[in-house]
Amino acid sequence: MKSIYWFRNDLRLEDNAALNSALNNSDHILFVHIDDDMNDAECEWQFPRRGQHRKIFMYQGLEELQLNLKSYGHYLNRFVGKTNLIFQELINRHHINSVYCESINAFEEQAQERLIKDLGVNLYSYYQSSMYMPHQLPFDIKDLPDVFTHFRKNIETTGIVPEEP
């Protein structure tokens, strides 16, 4: 099976459930990062979606990721443009069956995932943005304590251990 591993915000090679799944379930993997055009546009309130510091931080992280992938004999394919159009081209050119990525719970990022599904490939997205998964918590997300100390004490008394990827 040919897959794409789509690096979004999480640029880790270790402790990465989505990447582990891609590696375990794919014969060939194309490693991809897309800097979507929308990141440089202003939002509806005329603020930049991404500031200069974030750009520099991402650039440095991507450079380090490229070096890390290279040490394993792989290459990070970096693109700038519209995410759905880039994926359409990659899927057609490389006969991709599946896309693996981290799940980002934000409106535009979820819309990107829907567009990729519409291209006819399997999309496997993994929530990996926090130490504890929502199903591990001893309460519903809607009942999340307002104060961190209450959250911490609740977690400490239940003995929950973060899941391995």
Give short role names for the model-derived ranges.
Residues 1-162:
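Trp/Phe/Arg-rich N-terminal binding region typifying the photolyase-homology
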